[in-house]
Amino acid sequence: MFLTACGFSPVYNENNTTKLIQQISIQEPSTQEEFIFYSHLVDRFGSMGDKYVLNYAISTSTEDSALDFDGTVHRIEISGSVSFSLKDKENGINLLSDKEEMYLSYSNAGSTAAVLNAERTTNKQLVVLLADKVADRVSIAIVEKDL
């Protein structure tokens, strides 16, 4: 309650989050990573909005991150980044353009099936976390700019 008195209002209050539902048209996915990203954003914002357009480009890479002296790899790091832009659908004005990055890692120990499962799970978690970061940034931008 004291935040309202000073002019601040929570980003995640009911009015701000419901304002975004069905207002953002999200770029259609073309890869498995993009589908996971897209699905997560649709869960947050709905789909087929008519006010804003959200475009994105996802990239991931893997790197050995824990090696012992004989060169055995014990952990694999997956780095991911997403460049995104939010535009006004009516006039094409760019409202937000930025990049989010993060990384996760998984153990390379165990059976082939276990390692492949760890890789898939970690990759999915990374893309979901990137989608959360983008959704938060978009929500904050819309509230800050009072759109």
Predicted feature locations:
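Short amphipathic
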Residues: 23-29, 98-102
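Sec-exported extracytoplasmic/periplasmic mature domains
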Residues: 42, 46, 131, 135-139, ...
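C-terminal motif of bacterial Sec signal peptides marking the signal peptidase cleavage site
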Residues: 2-5
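Post-signal-peptide N-terminal segment of Sec-exported extracytoplasmic proteins
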Residues: 27-59
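Bacterial signal peptide processing site
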Residues: 7-10
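Surface-exposed short loop/turn segments
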Residues: 49-99, 103-121, 128, 132
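Acidic/histidine-rich, surface-exposed loop or edge segments in extracytoplasmic proteins
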Residues: 18-27, 111-114
